[in-house]
Every structure is written in C-alpha cells, then in structure tokens.
Amino acid sequence: MEIINSDEINWTELFLNNEFIVVNYQPSLDCIGCKEINDLFEELSLEKKYSKVKFLWVDSRNNPIAEQFIKKRQTPFIAVFKEGFLVECDNISNETGLREMLERLFAFKFKL
C-alpha cells in the first residue's frame, strides 16, 4: 500500500492512470480500528485478484473534505473510485466488509 500525504497527490493523474482506486482516509496509521484495515490493504494489494486496484492511505488531517467526513462518522473511512468517479464510501473495519465493497466496485456499471 502506498502511504501518501493528500497534499502530494496529483488526483487528476491518479484517476487517469488507474481504473480502480481504494482510499483509506484516517488521521493516523495507528487509530482505533485502523490497524486491521491497514494490514488488510497490504494483503489485498498483493492478491492477483486486486492487481488492478490502487490502494492508498490518505492522512485525513491534510484533507478538509475527508476530515469533515471523519468528524461525523468514524475511521477508517474508505472511498472507492472507478474510472475517476466515486462509487461508494463508508466506514469499513473488517475484511468481509472491504471485500464486499471491492466486489461492488468491480461490478459497478455506469448508467447512460
């Protein structure tokens, strides 16, 4: 998993070069409930099934929008994108929830 500061992200380039993106917004790497998701991101990023998925951790303290989500909800806060569009976002704190979210991401079809 790539750990980056949201100030260092070129979001346009990221979305243009990656079909599937999963972002874990959290205030630190050791927040309550975050360690399990961080470890799971690492594991999933190595699985062949998820080889086309870009997994990122973004420090929510440097991202005003993410910070507002987290104030109203809990961490870890996961957002999934397909071809640059937000498909789903929610609090996910276990393997089953994250794998189900990824399956919905893969199955998502744009409506014209």
What is each PLM-predicted segment?
Residues 1-21, 97-112:
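N-terminal leader/targeting and pre-domain segments
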Residues 3-6, 25-27, 38, 45, ...:
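Thiol-based oxidoreductase modules, predominantly thioredoxin-like and allied folds used
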Residues 22, 55, 78-80:
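Structural signal for hydrophobic/aromatic residues that build the beta-strand cores
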Residues 31-34:
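Short cysteine clusters
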Residues 36, 69, 91-93:
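Short coil/turn segments at secondary-structure boundaries
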Residues 68-74:
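A short glycine-leucine-enriched loop at secondary-structure breakpoints
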Residues 74-112:
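Non-catalytic, surface beta->alpha helical segment in thiol-disulfide oxidoreductase systems
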